[in-house]
Each structure stands twice: as C-alpha cells, then as structure tokens.
Amino acid sequence: MKSNKYDIQDTEIRVIGESSSSPKRKWGWIILAAALMIGVIASIIAFSRTSSQEEVGVFEKAAHQPIPHPLRGWIQSLDRITDICVVTKDTTVNDIPMRLYVPLNMTPHLEVGYTCIDDTTNNMLLWQAADVRADNQKIVGAFVLRGKPLSWGLSKKGYCGIIGDQVTIGVADNSPLFEQATEVGGYFFRQYPLVSNGMLVENELKSQSTRRGLCELEGKVVVVETFTPESLHDFSQALVDLGTTNAIYLVGSSAIGWHRNIDGVGIASGQWEPRVYKNVSFIVWSK
C-alpha cells in the first residue's frame, strides 16, 4: 500500500503549528535592539564630550572666564555730567589695583616740551604720550603736532589720532589718520598696542613697572593707571576684562602725570625733575 506523505510513522514526531516566530516576538526583538543601539550611541557621545573637556588638576587653576565688570554701568552713568571735569574711580581687576581717569566734555591735544605741565590753571589732565629714544632722544614712532610731522617710523603699531573733536585709538601698520592729521592741523602719535577690538595684543616688553594705558571704554576715552608694577601682558588682560575695546600704552614707570580732581585739587604723579628731554610729549586735556 502506498504511503501518504501526511501519515505519521511510529518513529516520527511531528509538531503542529506555525514554523516561524509570532509577530509579537519579532517586534520585541526589534525594540530591544533599537534600545541597545540608542544606549551605545548615547554612551559614545557622552564619552566624546568628556574627553574634549580640559582636565584640570587639583593644583591647577581653571581656565579664565571673564565676567562683565561692574564699572561698565558706572561709565554710562557719567553721561549725565555736563561740567568740564575729570572723574576718577579706583577698582581692582584680576588682583591688579588700578585707577580710571575719565575726562568729560573735553578733547585732548598733544604738546611737546615741559611747558604744559606748569599750566595748572587750564589743564585738567595730562600724561606722557610717546616714548623718547635712548640713543638720540628723538620721539619714537610717527608723531604729528598741530598738523606738523615731527617724527616718522613704525616701531610700534598702536596709534592715537586726534582730528577735530574725534579721538581714535587703534592698531595698524598704516593709518590714514597720520596723513589726515597733517592736512587738517590734527595730532597723531604711536605707542605699544594693548587691546585691539576687544582682544589682547602681545608685546615683547616683559619687564614689570607701573602701567598706564589710553583706552576706549564704552564710547569714552579713559586713562587707566596701575598702583602696582605689572607686566604688559597682565595689564593688557586686565584692560580686556575691564571691557575696553581698543587701548594703547602711555609711558609708564616714573613718567610724569597730573590731573585736577573733582574738588579742583591738582594731583601729580611720577618724577617731575630733572627735565632733561626736550622732545618729551604729553597728551593733554584742557578747559
């Protein structure tokens, strides 16, 4: 007798049911695999972020994170003052004690020689501007006095141009303000650059001394002076953290400075004697 393929033999075991897994079991495996994949990806991302962060040891200082300096609001409040005066403010930035001199309602000009420091009637604020060369005692860098060029050169890339009542502080190899000053009877001088567009400018000068800077701060021209000897790098960084947009150096150390305070009292700084450099220059604010 011919056997049927559906007949069950004595030695056979046949399982009755579907040969493939149920749909629910398939979806369960898919969901589990997806969850595992997501977990692996999340772990990789977290590890990469952790690896990219700077590892700071217990004896190291974390990276410097500057915060807005509280004097920024104070500078803006001076707009209400209409008198011709010099307002000062003492503060500390990055552990550097310093003083801000803010001349109000005045435009500076340049002077050469010591005559201006004896005029304590009209002058309100003055500081030495350009450096004097040690070899021939001439002015260092380009210098224009009331439209007349007294010196040429690009030993320092920082500059200050005074055209009419507009004061411009900047950093550049060549500035059109030099030519413009010669054409319209303006002023121009060069110094070490400290801050350019809110960024610190490095200089080769590494010594420490009292530092002074001519700065642009919230639309105003201010002079900043340290009370302690500082490197040019630390001084520049403090000016950046203070919020200055642009800044150049003014002669520091024992150089001559003078201002009339809000009470009308004249206060001198630096060494006023002996007066030996005929080409000494000053930036002066007068009534």
State the predicted function of each range.
Residues 127-128, 133-199:
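Active-site-adjacent helix-turn-beta-strand microarchitecture at beta-sheet edges
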Residues 93-98, 162-166, 216-222:
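Beta-strand-turn-beta hairpins that frame and shape the catalytic cleft
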Residues 89, 159, 213:
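Short, surface-exposed charged micro-motifs
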Residues 2-152:
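Zymogen propeptides
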Residues 137-154, 207, 216, 220-245, ...:
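Conserved, well-ordered active-site substructure
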Residues 185-224:
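Flexible, glycine-rich surface segments
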